[in-house]
Amino acid sequence: MSETPSSSETRPSSAVVLAAGEGIRLRPLTANRPKPMLPAGTRPILEHVLNALIDAGVDDIHLVVGYQANRVRSYFGSTYRDVSITYHTQANQLGSGHALLQARDGPEGPFLLVNGDQIIDHRIVEAVSGAHSDAATLAVVEGPEAVDYGAVHLKGNTITELIEQPASGEFRLFNAGVYAFSQRIFDVLETLSVERGELPLTDAIQSLIDEDDHTVNGVRTDHFWMDATHPWDLLSLSRELLTRGWVDAPTVDTDIYVAESAHIHPDATLVGPVVVDSDVVIEAGAVVGPYAAIGSSATIGSGTVLSDVVIDTDTAIGPNTTAIELVAGQGCELGAALTVGGGPADVVLDEEVYSDVDLGGVIADRVDVGGGATLEPGALIGPGSTIASGVVVRGHIDAGSEVVR
């Protein structure tokens, strides 16, 4: 499909990133940090987003923060990769349109807009930026996910309608969440009212579509993008990143990535794809991988076997543990001989049942698990909990719980 190239006056060099949301469906992992700061591989999702923007030529970033905003500010500071970051606060979570309005005094001229909780290939950003020439430009993807993400009607390069809740299977083109806007979007947003507790960005885009003197363009793309809706999606994200080699650690073998400061015992085995971040210690006899992402300063005990796992920073796993399809948060102490056998499992989140999920378990931040414990498939342990030795964990454990035999 042909695209109308943008002029230097309309090609955006600034970007707004929406990173204010909590991510309720990702609990218990989001109890203490926002969804964009959850791990994708060994880096926060938001870090991957900023990398994509900068790789696409963005030199001015505006972050809209809200829930647990200090977790974002303290991690990134005022610059990232020599690009300045300006923070804007959304005090109340009133939707994506309301979030964007908080950055009205930020970018001058045309700008890009992306979600801070969705990993995108920088080539999608480049395509949207390069095609932008009027009020708005959207990345459009073809696939069955239109039911979940909102469908679009595309006539040539022009979007004629957004369909927020399409009937299943009726539409194949959907909004990928990568945008370029003129300043007109702010004027439109200010004419809209908050209804049903939120101000959706899509309402403003539809208003632009309905205006006779503006055009909303669509750019079709088949480049990689992915987000995490549920805790087990972090495993899928990690698999995709490892498969593509989208990791920071140096390559020591074809698909084995190990930071220089990591300490791998000569008798330990890494099975690719696997990434081991800085200051990790992996002891003798451990087998790590495939599809394992080990965050900085983690410790993997002797004889432990890990496969299809995301282990976040500062977490220690005791010896002789076996864990499959496990997401473990920051600062956890997991005792010796822990068993996490992997899915499938029926998982209950917010009173909704998800069947046949490939999930061994989720352990949120700062959890202590005693030796010889077992996580039944799909177990969810809230932050700050203590699980005694030998306990069999099933279902959901609330934050701060103490579970004994």
Q: Which residues are covered by each model-predicted region?
A:
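Short N-terminal binding/cap micro-motifs at the start of the first secondary-structure element
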Residues: 23-28, 147
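Conserved donor-nucleotide/metal-binding helix-loop-beta segment in metal-dependent transferases, i.e.
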Residues: 123-148
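Catalytic-core segments of class I nucleotidyltransferases/pyrophosphorylases
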Residues: 112, 129, 155-247
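The conserved acidic donor/metal-binding loop of glycosyltransferases
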Residues: 115-119
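Conserved N-terminal catalytic core of the sugar/cofactor nucleotidyltransferase
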Residues: 2-17, 25, 38-39, 43-114
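Short alpha-helix within the catalytic core of nucleotide-sugar-dependent glycosyltransferases
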Residues: 50-51, 101, 108, 121-130, ...
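Extended, small-residue-rich solenoid/repeat segments and analogous flexible loops
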Residues: 198, 207-297, 301, 305
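Glycine-rich hexapeptide-repeat left-handed beta-helix
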Residues: 308-405
